[in-house]
């Protein structure tokens, strides 16, 4: 019961933090920081797929060194496969798994285990959320399910932020096209269109 409570509290905290974000970059950063802190992991990273290069670009990270983050490109179709296959991938020993693209860099960084889950929006994989631990970790189904839920929330929040920014940009464009005078207050009231005798 204690662990269930911890998972619930963590999910609530992460959701509340993400809900206050205004852009996709902020969503990624808050997600990485919240997951790293909540799991007391070594680090957490959020990757987004570049459809042109077929690589996963780093969107945000917390707890990992710049040297490790700059280790090289992460191939969408090659490394680990959580994004490509749309399934979570739990690796107990990163030094003994052929799916790890940069094992030496992981060893130098002090990474023992890794959990990667896809970030999905509108049934399409847009990236991956990865949790790194310094000690060997047998990720339980509860761990995996929680990280999947957070990744899902992250994907939805990013999508909403993009829509909001696009909507805001469209309004600004319309204002510029029509002129600011058009949008000045015309003194409308809740009784607009109602006969004066009724409004009184």
PLM ranges: what are they?
Residues 66, 92-113, 133:
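Signal-transducing coupling segments at domain and membrane junctions
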Residues 33, 45-69:
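GAF sensory/regulatory domain recognition
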Residues 1-26, 166-193:
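Signal-transmission linkers at sensory-effector interfaces
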Residues 66-89, 102:
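Acidic/proline- and glycine-rich, intrinsically disordered low-complexity segments
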Residues 1-5, 132-149:
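Regulatory loop-to-helix N-cap segments in sensory/regulatory domains
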Residues 112-120:
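A short, aliphatic-rich beta-strand micro-motif
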Residues 148-156:
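Allosteric cytosolic regulatory segments
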Residues 119-133, 157:
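Sensory-domain boundary capping and coupling elements
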């Amino acid at each position: 019961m204690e662990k269930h409570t911890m998972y619930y509290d963590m999910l609530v905290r992460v959701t509340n933090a993400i809900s206050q974000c205004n852009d996709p970059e902020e969503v990624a950063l808050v997600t990485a920081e919240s997951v790293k802190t909540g799991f007391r992991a070594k680090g957490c990273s959020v990757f987004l797929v570049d459809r042109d290069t077929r690589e996963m670009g780093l969107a945000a990270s917390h707890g990992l060194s710049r040297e490790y983050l700059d280790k090289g490109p992460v191939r969408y179709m090659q490394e680990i496969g959580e994004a490509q296959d749309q399934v979570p991938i739990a690796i107990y020993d990163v030094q003994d798994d052929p799916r790890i693209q940069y094992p030496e860099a992981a060893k130098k960084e002090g990474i023992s285990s890794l959990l990667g889950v896809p970030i999905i929006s509108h049934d399409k994989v847009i990236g991956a959320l990865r949790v790194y631990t310094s000690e060997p970790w047998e990720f339980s189904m509860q761990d995996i399910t929680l990280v999947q839920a957070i990744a899902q929330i992250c994907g939805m929040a990013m999508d909403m932020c993009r829509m909001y920014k696009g909507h805001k940009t469209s309004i600004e464009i319309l204002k510029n096209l029509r002129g600011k005078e058009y949008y000045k207050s015309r003194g409308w009231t809740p009784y607009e269109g109602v006969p004066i005798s009724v409004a009184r």
